[in-house]
Amino acid sequence: MFTIALPKGALLKDSISTFKRAGLDFSDALEKNNRSLTFESNCKRAKALLVRNGDVPVYVSYGQADLGIVGYDVLRESELKVAKLLDLGFGGCHMSLAVKKNSNYLKPTDLPANCKVASKFIKTARFYFEELNIPVEIVHLTGSVELGPITGMAEAIVDLVATGKTLKENGLIKIDDLFYSTARLIGNPLSMRLDDNHLRDTILSIESTNDT
């Protein structure tokens, strides 16, 4: 039996559907009254751990899970050593730079040197501005980063944007996209090397059904 890390939240339903098409059914994890954090597939070939999206690469990297599904945004920010297996295509959103709508900033280079930029993704934000050679101070927030510009603590934010509705409701606009993030299938490197074809067969099944 091998172990899969499934992300709680927005990616969970599609993640379960992905494995179900490959013959591993963890539908019990979607039951509203179920408080369990571990689930066996109906076929008893695998078990799933229900974890926070940001913890998926941690469990996979440290070997507590052999496979996992995680957003590319989290995977890129974590920089943990995992095998990057498949782009699953769902959960799409942009990592974006946004500012107040009534500001004079139309592009990244309009931001003043050494201004503050709020983000949950501090490594991603720092790398982005270093590549542009724009000196900024990254302010790490774990909640609603939109409050950074609203309160005057920051001139801009770097955050995930799906529909743009939250930005609009808070008087913010995008001025650049860093990258497009989708759900990714990842694996533990050692598990992949020691695999007796159970992981390989699952990955191939996911790949074949994901293309249809």
Curated annotation (Swiss-Prot):
In this record, what's one Pfam family?
HisG
- What is the documented function of this protein? Catalyzes the condensation of ATP and 5-phosphoribose 1-diphosphate to form N'-(5'-phosphoribosyl)-ATP (PR-ATP). Has a crucial role in the pathway because the rate of histidine biosynthesis seems to be controlled primarily by regulation of HisG enzymatic activity.
What note about domains is in the entry?
Answer: Lacks the C-terminal regulatory region which is replaced by HisZ.
Whether ATP-binding counts among this entry's keywords is yes
Q: Which domain of life is it from?
A: Bacteria
Q: What is the lineage of its organism?
A: Bacteria, Bacillati, Cyanobacteriota, Cyanophyceae, Synechococcales
Q: Which InterPro entries match?
A: ATP_PRibTrfase_cat, ATP_PRibTrfase_CS, ATP_PRibTrfase_HisG, ATP_PRibTrfase_HisG_short
Q: What EC number(s) has UniProt assigned to this enzyme?
A: 2.4.2.17
What keywords were assigned to this record?
A: Amino-acid biosynthesis, ATP-binding, Cytoplasm, Glycosyltransferase, Histidine biosynthesis, Nucleotide-binding, Transferase
Q: Where is the signal peptide?
A: none
Q: Which GO terms describe its cellular component?
A: cytoplasm
Q: Report the GO molecular function annotations.
A: ATP binding; ATP phosphoribosyltransferase activity
| Pathway per the UniProt entry | Amino-acid biosynthesis; L-histidine biosynthesis; L-histidine from 5-phospho-alpha-D-ribose 1-diphosphate: step 1/9
* Catalysed reaction equations from the record: 1-(5-phospho-beta-D-ribosyl)-ATP + diphosphate = 5-phospho-alpha-D-ribose 1-diphosphate + ATP
Q: A GO BP term, please?
A: L-histidine biosynthetic process
Coiled-coil residues are none
Assembly description: Heteromultimer composed of HisG and HisZ subunits.
Q: Which gene encodes it?
A: hisG
Localization, UniProt: Cytoplasm
Q: What is this protein called?
A: ATP phosphoribosyltransferase
The answer to whether the entry has keyword Kinase is no
